[in-house]
Amino acid sequence: MFKVDLNSDLGESFGAYKMGMDEEILKFVSSVNVACGFHAGDPCVMDETLNLAKQNGVCIGAHPSYPDLLGFGRRNMQISFEEAKNYALYQLGALFGFAKAKGMKIQHCKAHGALYNMAAIDENLALALCEAVASFDENIIFLGLSNSAMNEAAKKKGLRYANEVFADRAYNDDGTLVSRKLEGALIHDENLAIKRVIKMIKESKVTSINGKEIDLKADSICVHGDNAKALEFVKKIKENLKKEQIQICALENFI
């Protein structure tokens, strides 16, 4: 039987600003990526997100970002190796404080937004993130784009790596994600997205935006929780995976 993790980026409200349907989404995923304050999230939101994750038996992961609240972490920044490492460590530490207080552990770490996209192609940046994780806790799984520079960096730092694929994003011919700024970057057809997910899991392939067949590995599927259809979408994905006899379970159970 195929096994796959279903993850979502949550805990992205802060202050008076509310985002997503975290309480509902957490009923359907196996892992959650928790914003750590640099692109979204705040101490109270982190606390509540972990409470909800614990109630639903969902594993937690740190979701570090560039320091970019105004741009939601989606703007690229030129930072040094040490800055990248320290920003990641700082955010890991923030999540760890809440996790420890609640008797929980950090299962994985997944970079957010522009930091994620840059680390997928810049091995030096990926190495900085992996060094931060390895120095913090070598048992934490590094979650990143399938067949990217992050995979190689994790190997070099002795970390377990989970290959992530996206249900609602289009791919370039080189396996990177199509920029959100471009037409066709987001897949709005739920049935098409589900078919693509099943193909990625069972055949280890996806069709790029230009029609090219790309090889990849699907350990974890990301379903975004920041749009109006997110809840129905994640419900349908879970239902269809079960129909295909694909077991949904957290990364720690098979990576």
Curated annotation (Swiss-Prot):
NCBIfam families referenced in this protein's UniProt entry, alphabetically: PRK05406.1-3, PRK05406.1-5
Superkingdom of source: Bacteria
Enzyme class, first EC level, given as a word: hydrolase
Organism (species): Campylobacter jejuni (strain RM1221)
Protein name: 5-oxoprolinase subunit A
Gene this chain is encoded by: pxpA
Family from the record: Belongs to the LamB/PxpA family.
Keyword entries, A-Z: ATP-binding, Hydrolase, Nucleotide-binding
Catalysed reaction, written as an equation: 5-oxo-L-proline + ATP + 2 H2O = L-glutamate + ADP + phosphate + H(+)
Quaternary structure annotation from Swiss-Prot or TrEMBL: Forms a complex composed of PxpA, PxpB and PxpC.
